[in-house]
Design a protein with these regions (language model features):
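Extended, highly charged
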Residues: 1-272, 277-287, 291-475
Length: 475
């Protein structure tokens, strides 16, 4: 099932018992964020949350944790809620191969029902804003998609980027935005500022789950998130034209903000509790001026809690990081079997591969660090053999404990790039990277004194299936 907007997704969650409606009166702070934080502390299957009785807000409707469990993630892909995580990733990979799927242009988007322009804009009136963590420097929009175009190639649909970036609400029509240098919007801004220009952008709030997943997925520079969204949802993705910028935006969004990143202008932004589980601190960041707002009547506001894992962002970013890394590595190294980059947006990746020759696994690890995502995120790689499942942590721990000799199996790479939000980097944005080779050596590599590894007995698979069926029949 493909969801054209947030509302149809929420209805599907409700139908599956995965939307918890909280009718009692709550405070915007700290209740909304604390409840979302709590969903990551109550075990598997946490629901999405719905609030419509918020003290101090008139008729505000807020939803959080919409993709904050593997059940909800499965529903977002149109899969049964009990679909195992590995099968969800396998399905993600299968659908990826359908790229590109041309989007469907639609008229009369619901977000065109109401508009506000120029100095009449007051974001504090339109959006029910609240802080997510006690140390945040202000109100943040953190689950929105930002649309930008390459200023030197404006008509190239593939170079129109859709990405998720945090934005601090700093005034009635002013935002602070952090363009991470490794992301496409940073390149768009660089090109605009070289020409002495502002960079037009459109900001979409309250989106369907698939474009949200795509906004968190590291695609190549000329790959369209809308075309990949169509592949992932297995039907053309619906888009409409934003009235001020003329950009392509999701047809089903709740709110559209249009304006510009003001060229060569920076102001202090932050601090903000980030996906790393740490506050990022305050830094000089870009300034956004909002010139037009379009919104549905009674819009639904969606926000994302970030903090110590696991929270919703880990479910959102995990598969969306594993799959592109796998696809990019598999295209160059067919021996690669699987990639687990579920942890902190891929700052750690576990990769299983066959080996053609000695040192091969390390070469794969190096390539992972130089993919578009790896340049800014993949800080540590654990390489394992093809018979080790990267998603089975006991197997990974076995490989680490039995196959690694620290004297020669740790490859340290000094002064490499990483996103500035990595709290371990020093200075911010520079770090040493590490490859841990937990594979069995092949010629001419002569590490260790390995004998033949113990394999499962040939009959084990059949017995596993038989025992599983017997247990199921006993219930």
């Amino acid at each position: 099932m493909a969801f054209d907007d947030l509302r149809s997704f929420l209805q599907a969650l409700d139908d599956q018992g995965q939307l918890l409606k909280i009718s009692e009166e709550v405070n915007a702070e700290p209740d909304l964020a604390a409840a979302a934080n709590a969903t990551g502390r109550i075990g598997d299957g946490a629901p999405a949350l719905w609030f419509d009785n918020i003290r101090g807000f008139n008729d505000a409707r807020v939803t959080m944790n919409t993709i904050g469990s593997w059940q909800n993630h499965a529903i977002s892909l149109g899969l049964p809620p009990n679909t195992p995580v590995k099968k969800q990733i396998d399905e993600f990979i299968r659908r990826w191969d359908n790229f590109p799927v041309t989007p469907e242009r639609r008229a009369n988007p619901a977000w065109a029902e109401n508009t506000v322009d120029g100095d009449d804009i007051n974001l504090f009136d339109i959006l029910p804003l609240f802080r997510l963590n006690d140390g945040d420097g202000g109100f943040y929009l953190d689950k929105v998609c930002v649309v930008s175009r390459d200023p030197l190639d404006k008509d190239n649909f593939g170079k129109q980027n859709v990405g998720i970036y945090r934005m601090e609400v700093k005034g009635k029509r002013k935002l602070g935005l952090q363009p991470v240098p490794m992301h496409d919007i940073a390149l768009h801004l660089h090109k605009a500022e070289e020409r002495g220009e502002d960079l037009p952008i459109a900001i979409t709030l309250g989106n369907d789950p698939i474009i949200t997943l795509m906004g968190a997925t590291p695609l190549k520079y000329d790959q369209s998130e809308y075309e990949m969204a169509g592949a992932l949802r297995e039907s053309p993705y619906p888009i409409a034209i934003a009235p001020l910028t003329g950009f392509d935006v999701p047809w089903g969004s709740e709110v559209i903000l249009e304006g510009v990143i003001e060229g060569r202008k920076r102001e202090i932004e932050g601090p903000f509790g980030e996906f790393t589980g740490h506050y990022s601190g305050g830094r000089n960041m870009t300034v956004v001026r909002i010139d037009k707002v379009s919104y549905r009547s009674k819009p639904i506001f969606e926000s994302l809690y970030l903090g110590m894992p696991w929270t919703e962002i880990d479910y959102l970013m995990g598969p969306a990081t594993c799959v592109p890394l796998y696809q990019q590595l598999k295209a160059e190294f067919p021996e690669v079997q699987a990639v687990n980059a579920m942890y902190t947006h891929g700052l750690l990746a576990i990769i299983s591969t066959k080996k053609r020759y000695g040192g091969f696994a390390r070469a794969v690890g190096l390539r992972a660090m130089t993919t578009p995502h790896g340049l800014g995120y993949v800080k540590m790689v654990i390489m394992v053999d093809e018979d080790v499942d990267p998603f089975n942590l006991p197997q990974v721990m076995w490989a680490l404990s039995s196959k690694v000799n620290p004297a020669g199996d740790l490859v340290q790479l000094p002064n490499m790039s990483v996103l500035e939000l990595d709290p371990g980097s020093s200075p911010a944005g520079i770090t040493d990277k590490l490859i841990i080779d937990a594979t069995t050596p092949v010629a001419p590599d002569l590490r260790g004194h390995y004998s033949q590894p113990v394999q499962d007995l040939p009959e084990t698979k059949a017995w596993a299936e038989k025992l599983t069926a017997m247990l199921a029949n006993r219930k």
